[in-house]
């Protein structure tokens, strides 16, 4: 399920995407908070580089509220198209993080992900709020193009997560 909020005159937009997975929240959390898990979600369209100081660390080992480094988005895994100046705003309670960062083309980027157990599986809930930088907004159709790209990307991420979880469930049975 995908929701979009924001008005034509507003520079900020918000998306929410939810998916139900057939594996536990703990198992999903272990996957989605690793560089490998993040890049698996983005594959094949994007790959994110990992700043050196973050390599080999679990999300709960990272400081909140501090700049953590620059991650590059590589289209098809090779072509740099944007960067993310990563700041982890919050971790927890339980299986939750909130990233508040900026990018080359996006002034503010707030990505909150919550994973919770439901029934015999789990639910992944992403909430993304962003504000594009003004120069891009002067290009006719740019805002709509960016919204379309981000909607596609988050749907794709959840499709990849659903596929990963189904494969994990098969392995566990």
Report each predicted region and the residues it spans.
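Beta-strand/loop substructures that line and gate deep hydrophobic ligand-binding cavities in soluble
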Residues: 98-152
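Glycine-rich portal/gate segments that line the openings of hydrophobic small-molecule binding cavities
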Residues: 50-104
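Alpha-helical packing segments of well-folded alpha/beta enzyme cores
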Residues: 153, 157-161
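A short, structured loop/turn motif at beta-sheet edges
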Residues: 22-25, 88-94, 114-125
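Hydrophobic ligand-binding cavity/cleft-lining segments
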Residues: 2-63
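Short, surface-exposed coil-to-beta transition loops
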Residues: 14-16, 80-85, 107-112
């Amino acid at each position: 399920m995908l929701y979009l909020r924001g008005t034509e005159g507003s520079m900020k937009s918000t998306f929410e995407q939810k998916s139900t997975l057939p594996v536990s929240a703990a198992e999903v959390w272990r996957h989605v908070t690793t560089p490998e898990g993040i890049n698996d979600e983005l594959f094949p369209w994007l790959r994110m580089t990992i700043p050196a100081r973050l390599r080999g660390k679990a999300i709960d080992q990272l400081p909140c509220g501090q700049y953590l480094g620059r991650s590059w988005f590589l289209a098809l895994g090779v072509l740099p198209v944007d960067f993310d100046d990563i700041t982890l705003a919050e971790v927890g309670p339980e299986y939750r993080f909130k990233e508040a960062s900026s990018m080359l083309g996006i002034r503010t980027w707030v990505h909150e992900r919550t994973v919770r157990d439901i029934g015999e599986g789990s639910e992944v809930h992403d909430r993304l709020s962003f504000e594009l930088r003004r120069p891009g907004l002067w290009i006719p159709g740019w805002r709509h193009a960016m919204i379309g790209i981000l909607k596609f990307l988050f749907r794709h991420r959840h499709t990849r997560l659903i596929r990963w979880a189904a494969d994990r469930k098969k392995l566990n049975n």
